[in-house]
Amino acid sequence: MLINKRKRRKAYIYNDGYEYINKKIKNKFIFICLIAVGGFSCVYKIKKKEKKEKKGKKKKEKYYYDQKQNCKDKFYALKKIKFHANPKNLKEQILLNLREIKYLNLLKKYTNIVYPHEYWIEIYKPFYKQKKIKSDKKKKNKKKIKKQKLSLFKDTIKIIKKRKKDKLKKKKKIEFFFKNIQYSSDTDDIKITFEDAHPEKVKNNNNIKDIKYIKKKVQKDYKKNNKKNDKNNVNKNNTYNNKYKVVINKIIGKKYIINKIKINRNKKIYIYRHMYGHIYGHMYGHMYDLFNINKNSYYTYNNNNNNNNNDKFKSLKGLKRNNLFINKNQTIPYPSSCYYYSSHTTNKFKSLNEKQFTYVSSFSSHMWCTASRRKTFSYNQKDNYQEIKKLNKYYNYKSSNFLDKQILNKQSMFYQNKINNKKNDHNVVLKTLQTFYDDTYIYNLENVDTQETKQYSNYNNIENVKNVKNVKNVENVKNVENVENIEDMKKKKKNKFVIYNNIYTMQNIKYTSYKSNVFFIDHDVNICNSYSLPNIFTCKTKNKHNAFFFPRHTKFNNRPSKNKKYRLSQRKYYINNYKNKGIKFKLKKIIRKMFQMKNKLRCVTGTYINNYKIGKTIVKNNKKNIKNNNNNKKNNNNNTNKKKYYFYNQHSPCIDIFKKTKRRKKKKKKKKKKKKITFINLLFNNQIKYQTKNCKNKINNIQSRECAHKILSCHHVFILLYYIYKNKTSISELLYEQYINNIKKNFLINKLINLYIPIYNYSEYSFNISFIYYILSNKKRKQFKPTNILSPQVYSYFYYSNVLFGSRYVHQKKKIHRNIHKSKLSNMYAHLSNLDLFLCYRNKHIYKYIKKRQALFNFFFYKRSYITHYEKYFTNKHFIKTQKSQLKHFTRRPTLKMSENNYSSKNYILKKCYMFKIKKKIVKNVNIRRNKNMCMYLSYVIHIIKSHNLCNKINKEFNKQLTNNVCKKKVARQIILDIFYNKTHPRHHIIKYTYNFYKKNICLSGCKKRIFLKIYCFHKGGYVFSRLYGREIKKKKKIERIRNIQVQKQMDYKSRPFINNKRSSKISKQIIYFSLNIILKNYIDYILRKRYFLCSYDHNLIERKWLMYYFTKVVSKYFLNPRKDNNNNNIMFNNNNIMFNNNNIMFHNNNIMFHNNNIMFHNNNIMFHNNNSMFNNNNIMFHNNNIMFHNNNIMFNNNNIMFHNNFIVNNYMDKYKNMFIKSCNDKSIPYQMLANLQNEYYLSKGNNNKMNITTTYLYMKIRKILNKYSKRNEEKKNILKGKYCYNNGNFALLSYINKKHKHNKRYHQIKEKNGNNKETKYKFNLYIRMEYCKSTLENYINTRENMNINRNYEIIQMIILGLYSIHNNNIMHRDLKPSNIFISDNNIVKIGDFGLASYDYTYPKNRKRKKRKRKSSNLSYEYNIRKTNILNLQKNNTPFNIDKYNNNIIRKKKEILFKNCCTKNNIPTKEINSNSSFQYFTKKKKKKKNVHDHHTLGIGTKIYAAPEQLIGNKYTKAVDMFSLGLIIVDLFTITKTNMERMKILCNARHRILPDLLIKNHPQVAKLCQNLLSLDYHLRWTSEELYKKKKNIYIY
């Protein structure tokens, strides 16, 4: 489309959910906004300008039927126009509609379009500006006017410019537009028509007379008001009359005009929609003349229609224009209506029977009007189309309920249930939950674009209360049983009635409208409204009903009011009589307490949540009311004032609850106490609302109307008041058993998820709910009080078995909560406490749903305005002001204190958890790191992990390795996911988590998979853990004392066994639970927002069995079995799955997990699987042992390196040395370590009670044991002579040579066997387990069919990264070729085969360290251990093959190489191994070498080796760069045979590259020529290539 050509110079500003367009684009997009099908709302700013009147003059009353006073009000269009449309969204939304309908052909006829501000200018033009009209221009313009079919946007721009310059063009183009306005699409089946008036009316004489009458009035008024300006204004009357004709023709004819409605009160934002009579909206008198209706006939009513009550349409046939359609107080013009043809259904449905029409009723331009409504109904061609047109002409939404035949037939489910079920059934909740989604036509629409409907709000309307003499409503007659009583009421008294229409419409989908009953009540009525966007924000002027519709914040403050009347309204709520039968309802204690707190049930707008407003009326005892109302006689007594209860919302399930309640006794009323009910607000899910004035006033300031709209329009939460009565029925049964059978699951859910419709239940796939949880307080359980419940936004199935903490949460006596219904919602309530919520996702549909819900979470959960305000309140109120009160209550319970300096920092530091023992006072300071923002914000959850000192080290190292090395972030995620989905370890080890208390801080490990469980367990037992591990406790008595304190009175601590529940610790408990709830909720949101957490069907973390089984074991064993202790003071839970060591074993934050004494270290791709030990650091450097892990390439340069099956490397602290010595079996071995090592190595137990020792530790032990004894020299000689020998295939250890081992039988057996041997041999068998890579680069080159250039670039960059790390450590590979480059399963390239690698001694830094390294490299020399040769050398000079592609033979000869690489020239070598890679060994004494003699000659593969490596004595690390150049040539050439490949490589050694490579890849050819240069000083180094990274190929 043409939108793509636009230059976007300025960024779009996002403000309060509205997106504004740049000023330069406004002319383009207003055209689309006006013409877009489906009611797209465009905003156009029009400013009203009024003259200031003098102070002395009285203000004149404005009557809108005359034009005199209206001359003062001048409307003009501002230049600065803002729209709510983003061109990005317009592409996706509107233009999709245009493509589907092929509506572009239609739009070509809209080239002459008129905007509202231009109408105003044309009307009022003679009053403020006018110029002389020249006759010459008329002749010229007549020739130019033709039907021009041009592009959309160019025409609109040209027309607007021309109208500003030329006035005559405007007239004729307007006339041309309204003459040729017949619309037609490509198919002739449908014509879009505006039905308010037809061009036939112009022919009527009555209309013409009325127009003349209007002209005379206007001319007289004009002359009176404008006598002064007669000289300047020439031909004023003629121009005005001509324009007045045009305007009237526009009104009578078909037109397209847009009306405005104000959205926000503060900002000047308007919605404009199609409106008839916008120009003459202020003229009351003219409207009667235009439509040929007498003023007196508006309020007459045809009484003959009262008799026909059975037929729905008989009353409609007799209607005339004098019927009741306009109210007395109505100041708006006669509203019109028009048909839209919806954009979605054209291409999908062929027949007219399935096509869809939307009925849009107009609305007032005044601010007090409630809202606009959009009703949709399906239309069948067979039905009387013309009759429906006539009905819709005279339809007025203010006071009539007449809709189409389809709407009348498709009444609401509530209405049908009430008619069918005349008896008082108890299943009212079921009926209320059956919404309009049962319509069969919905299922025809399968795939709906979600982006079209995101920005459209739902319009839910309620008509005004009106005073009418004679009331008749055809639809609602059935709702009332006694028709005779109603007629008597009509005759005797004027009645006020309410019409409640709750109509949900989106742009593309059709729903039926449903209505609630009409209640005839003697007094004023509060009208419930499901508040939508226009309903909230359109109320500006002072209206009598504004207090009912739109309560202000000031009126309903949280403070208790001083007046008695307002107190009643704040505390008591009532329900109306069900069907006006006089049934009395009285509430039980729970329900009444629920409704005492009005602010808890109110939403952010000051309106009540979703539809659950409960009104209140007090009816006085009037005799007239008793006589008039037969239905209310039962309720009223002669002596007392009775109260009426009524619900306006029929959705609420409370009706069922109120029915079943019994009367309370008078004694209970007297003994009532004020009790608090906590309610979860939608905006602050984890918010604790304290009963203080400051809190409530500050929170109310946050609750603005704009934020409320975002919640109410996008997300309606169905609120359950849960209560089970006599074990008969429960809401969960109704929801999950009966109602699901009525809904088609497959069709509905796909639509509902895609459309963001406000849904009250999502069936069994996902149920959107928030709970109110309240427990009656008994005398025996005074300590238990209600707490806030965490309410995540997505639930499906909740599985809570009775095993959770035993069954001790269930009250045995009164049994309020029951565990009868398993795998249902009712089971959830049985265990609701602070954080006893787990999410159990059982269906794949939820993953799709969560993706769609991310926008809603970001929409109203992650706004900073809420967080910052509440943060200030929280810190000021509870941390600073209440420090003194908290310090008093330190006995036997933790309190949380915060300083003034810390509350503004990033983390709250809740200081000083105090604990007192019975005998001795032990005070421990534990710094608990918590979140800054006490609200839901995702980035701070990650900040909790990163803020700790120990975790910072891990994160820094991990990030460095990600940036510097080949490992990418995807690989890191895969490692975490492997642990997460149990690919690396069995299912038992799912729930293993370790608490780290280091330096008095609670440290959370960096692994993301364990955050959820850690925080959960910290809440349940965190304080216990902190108390246990604060100091070293060795004796069992002390441990038992601490446990006795912590688990005091277990029967009383049913909900929180580790915290006392006394009155003095209220604030501390609230702060604790507040902080903990937020962290867990943050992590739940974090799980919901990440894709890879919920991809699988059976998620391990979320599985019910494992969560419940392991967690109950941990908590129940720890709290309920305090006296059970294992050996060595180690508490083991979950079959050695979770280790809690009382001896303060620190599981240090290098992501080490103890799984059955098997530590897992994840190196990038180096896996040591001996007894499940894995290295978890990406690059572990053991330089002291000369074990080099360089980018997953292992260097083994020593001849004596020992590995054992049970080698484990652990990190512990120095203070735990004694414990580890005791835990070892061999207590005689002292503990001592090397000082040079960065990591200290300790001992731990093995499976077979053997010592697990590292290589360096083993050498240290041997040396220290030998040097301990008095006979050191003798034993050294004996060792050298070979008297002591212990041969084993797997293990050799000399630690048995100890004085204490003399009593050991095995010691004497060794002596007897080896006593005769003069020479002993110590055999050390080296076992190296390495990663298996399936393929090599050579296989990749041979097997590929086509050349993948991007893959070649990746391979080269990975090789450069490997060479960079090798060369930084002064190592030369010297045998780099495709067969030595491996490719792993993750397509990561790895360099291997370091058999020929050596140090670059020519490097100047290595010359000084030469002597040191030689000594340190030979550990056998230091430890006095005899040398051995690991490799079996081949002394004979036998020939061998270098490579399978080159069959040249190499022998000892001193011939010069390198005239032609492929000729048979032999390489001078010395002793040669049988493999292709070989090394030089001698048994002779070493001679002193010069610097040039360090590197051997003739090493490497002939083809890939550099020339100086084969000939010269001196070469450097540039040797590897030469072979890299040949590998690049090999990658970028494809050959069919090996001979072609060898020729290309031989020519490349002479810098002769193939022609195709130079043509297709010139940059790669330049790189190869540089790397293949004979002078190694000219070659690029690995550092230079690594620094360039992406710019490697640019030179």
From Swiss-Prot:
Documented EC number(s): 2.7.11.1
A single cellular component GO annotation: cytoplasm
InterPro entries from the UniProt entry: CC_SR_Kinase (IPR050339), Kinase-like_dom_sf (IPR011009), Prot_kinase_dom (IPR000719), Ser/Thr_kinase_AS (IPR008271)
Membrane topology: Single-pass type III membrane protein
Pfam family, one: Pkinase
Effect of a null allele: No defect in mosquito vector infection where formation of oocysts and salivary gland sporozoites are normal. Normal phosphorylation of eIF2alpha in response to amino acid starvation.
Primary location class: membrane
Recorded catalytic activity of this chain's protein: L-seryl-[protein] + ATP = O-phospho-L-seryl-[protein] + ADP + H(+); L-threonyl-[protein] + ATP = O-phospho-L-threonyl-[protein] + ADP + H(+)
Residues spanning the signal sequence: none
Location within or outside the cell: Membrane
Keyword ATP-binding: yes
Keywords: ATP-binding, Kinase, Membrane, Nucleotide-binding, Phosphoprotein, Protein synthesis inhibitor, Serine/threonine-protein kinase, Signal-anchor, Transferase, Transmembrane, Transmembrane helix
Changes after translation: Auto-phosphorylated.
Keyword hit for Nucleotide-binding: yes
Enzyme class, broadest EC rank: transferase
Domain Protein kinase: 1237-1594
Catalytic residues of the enzyme: 1375
Regions annotated as coiled coil: none
Ranges of the Lumenal topological domain: 1-28
Cytoplasmic side: 47-1595
TM segment ranges: 29-46
Gene Ontology biological process: negative regulation of translation; protein phosphorylation
Function field: Phosphorylates translation factor eIF2alpha in salivary gland sporozoites during dormancy, which leads to an inhibition of protein translation and accumulation of stalled mRNAs into granules.
Family to which the UniProt record says this protein belongs: Belongs to the protein kinase superfamily. Ser/Thr protein kinase family. GCN2 subfamily.
Stated name of the protein: Eukaryotic translation initiation factor 2-alpha kinase 2
Gene transcribed to yield this protein: eIK2
